[in-house]
UniProtKB/Swiss-Prot annotation:
Entry-linked Pfam families: zf-CCCH (PF00642)
Disordered: region residues: 11-77
Protein name: Zinc finger CCCH domain-containing protein 42
Gene3D superfamilies: 2.30.30.1190, Zinc finger, CCCH-type (4.10.1000.10)
UniProt keyword annotations, A-Z: DNA-binding, Metal-binding, Repeat, Zinc, Zinc-finger
């Protein structure tokens, strides 16, 4: 301790280091009185830069994790009763998305998901499941869904029409030739009566009967195309024997007047006119 004599009052003024320490502690508690060091300034600027780069809505605390962007799987339409999309069945994706007009089953690779269709041994089989391979009731269906009796998926490709006949239930395609109209030739079956009478077939390539070409020499058309009278005394008859189309005897001009009309699908039509009714 130091003793200081004051010239004014000749009194002792004792000084100690305690006020100085108090001043120092008070100045240390004041933030404005402390100037940060260069290392502290660099650290604070680095933390501020990292906070600025952090996306909005996330926390910088160590305990919280940043949410990741969830990638939602693309949805495809399910259309029961419509053929399956060939591109989706083969590759598992479809570029048309919800605009595609075909069906996109739950499992494009085929097979049955046991979690979707219950197996109930002893119950009757679900007819809708056996036919289409799907059941709209899912696990609530009360019938059996055997996985080994799924129907074979029919896949349609946007290509040209196949010239083969595909019988249901057969693994190999039955090769069937087509006539000049695109109708099937089946020599071992009966003649298509619709085609024989009208020259066309409403069933097309799916018809199970024979459609011979009109110019074949060994086929005989057993039916006549008779129509109502166009005018009094005028009738139309068709020449049905294809083997003798060019060998038909023409009546003499003394009895009849022969007028050739036209040739339609191999038929030669003639108008037999009575000379008394002719103009």
């Amino acid at each position: 301790m130091m003793q200081i004599l004051c010239e004014c009052c000749n009194s002792d003024h004792r000084s100690s280091s305690t006020p100085m320490a108090t001043t120092t502690s008070s100045s240390a508690s004041d933030p404005a009185a402390i100037s940060p060091t260069p290392s502290q300034q660099h650290a604070s600027s680095t933390v501020k830069t990292l906070d600025d780069r952090r996306p909005a809505g996330t926390s910088s605390s160590a305990g919280e994790t940043e949410p990741k962007a969830a990638v939602e799987p693309q949805e495809y339409p399910r259309r029961p009763g419509v053929p399956d999309c060939s591109y989706y069945v083969e590759f598992g994706s479809c570029k048309f998305g919800m605009r595609c007009l075909y069906n996109h089953p739950a499992k494009h690779a085929g097979g049955c998901d046991k979690l979707e269709h219950p197996q109930r041994p002893g119950e009757h089989d679900c007819l809708h499941y056996l036919r289409f391979g799907r059941c709209k009731y899912g696990m609530n269906c009360r019938f059996n869904h055997p996985p080994d009796r799924l129907p074979q998926q029919q896949v349609y490709f946007p290509w040209k029409a196949c010239h083969c006949h595909h019988s249901e239930g057969k693994s190999e395609a039955e090769h069937v030739k087509l006539n000049f109209l695109g109708l099937p030739l089946r020599p071992g079956t009966g003649l298509c009566s619709y085609y024989m009478n009208r020259g066309i077939c409403k069933f097309g390539s799916n018809c199970k009967f024979h459609h011979p070409n009109s110019g074949s020499g060994h086929e005989k058309w057993d039916g006549s195309l008779q129509t109502n009278q166009i005018s009094s005394g005028v009738n139309i008859y068709s020449v049905l024997d294809h083997g003798e189309l060019n060998e038909q005897p023409v009546p003499s001009k003394d009895d009849f007047q022969v007028s050739f009309v036209q040739n339609i699908v191999g038929f030669n039509f003639y108008i037999w006119c009575d000379p008394e009714l002719a103009p």
